[in-house]
Amino acid sequence: MGTLNNPVLHRELLVNLRTHRSFILLALYQLALCAVIYFAWPRELWLDLTENPQSTRNLVNLFFLGNFVIASLMTPTFAAGAITGEKERKTYEMLLASPLHPRAIVWGKLVAAMTYLAILVFTSLPVVMLCLPLGGVSFYEVLAAYVGLFCCLITFGMISVAGGVFFRRTSASLVASYLVILPLVLATILFWYSYESAGERRVNLTLVLFPCLALAISVPLFRMASKSLLYPSDLGSGGKEAIDLEKEAEESVGLVIRRDQFPDRLFAPPKRETLMEDGANPVYDKEMRSEIFGQGTLMLRLAIQVSMLLAIPLMAIFLYVFRSLSPFYLCYVLLFNLLIGPVFSAGSVTSERERQTLDLLLTTTLTPMQIFWGKLLSGLRVSSVLTAFLLWPLILALLTPTVPDYRMNFLTVIAWLLAVGLTCLTTANVGLFCSSFFHKTSTSLVVTYAVLVLLYFAPPAIRSFANEYFPVSSIQPVSWWLSALSPFVAVHEFPLYVDDLGGIPSRWAQSDAGTTSSLFGWPWRDLRHFGVYLLATILINVALSFGMTRMFRSRWRVSTSTD
């Protein structure tokens, strides 16, 4: 079946494009882009169009990269659940038994997921055309940027659809897609900025390289996904995939998780073969030993291997070569936790609703505090242990005699570790809070990611935007206080005194240390930002924990919550 008479495509388009969410999201997307253009519009009274104004190029780069990042982050939310949604709705077996060819199924899912994103990107074209009369950017650069953008979105969409073939849950497919897509997004941004001064070469490379890479990645993934649907794995009752953890460990490639050995048992303890001890929390024990890893360990193994692969070069560059840039390695650790943490918390309550066991859980003799802490600590334990694996290079650098800078900044390292720990707690709390409100795990996970992006990424983006386009304005203090909510800003603001290749960053000059207004040699003005972050994060977690405890005490509120 072709594109025009593909029933999968027709059904998906009707479901996706005729909902209120589609129109609301399109309106918000356009309003956000228009707001960026409006506030970043040059304030000069006179513009010399014969020159190449840098302000215009900055504006267009901001628009393109913002558009690219937002669209790239939205792609897995539309495509990662294309196949896993059928599995969760228990229609996957019916779809495989239909006369549709697997290629038609994959093609219909891919085109349907990408159609709405194509509409979002295409409708942004009139907005960017407003910048062309300002000069500095040619029409061919705009054309090349949109060609590269569409090629990237098609590639990311195919990665997300293919990920849904190998996972049963949308949450696992979503996280696996992000693990693969985010490094590609960063590489694309680096490519765009590295050729900023060579506009013609960037246009030629974009028009030639991006389509070739898109075909090289998308075509093999399309064939692999079609073959997997043609020869699916064993299906159990209700069309559920039968997963044997021992067989999966034998056939796995690369990392193998041994649940009975250290350190794997820290985040994946083996299944219980004896009775629980008296006073043990049955919710916590069930979540840790059966629930979290009940659908296999493929997503977990992929997350560990990708994170370790990226950590090796980042560790060498930021922790040993350019030690003044070591906060960027902490940013990588924080980003990993923001990506992996909600997976183990955002489905804690929604999974009970999907199995229709939540009412049974709420009518047991377990207290609300036991249910709440069991759900929270299980997800927090897994995410924090996985995140701690990435902190071993920092601990190693602290103990290495040939790198004395970190021992000289011992309190700074402790503050970094504290920021990572608070971030782990916040991601688990936000995920569990969203899971208490929504009915589907996929919805809860997407909302959790959206909340964390608004909480941790939007404030530093607003601060950077204000510094660039409103350097002397009353908005500066507001942007400073908002940025205090983000741990990414906090790890950079904490003072770090290192002798990096013979030079010390001016903002962290040694002359500031030891002043009269200081704590252990660090000026109070450098500690102020981290203190605000510490206080704000503690208040947020206390408020979320208190709210969820109240909800679990009022059992009917959790039981009857809907989308």
What is the meaning of each model-derived region?
Residues 104-117, 161, 165, 370-383, ...:
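Start (N-cap) of specific transmembrane helices in multi-pass transporter permeases
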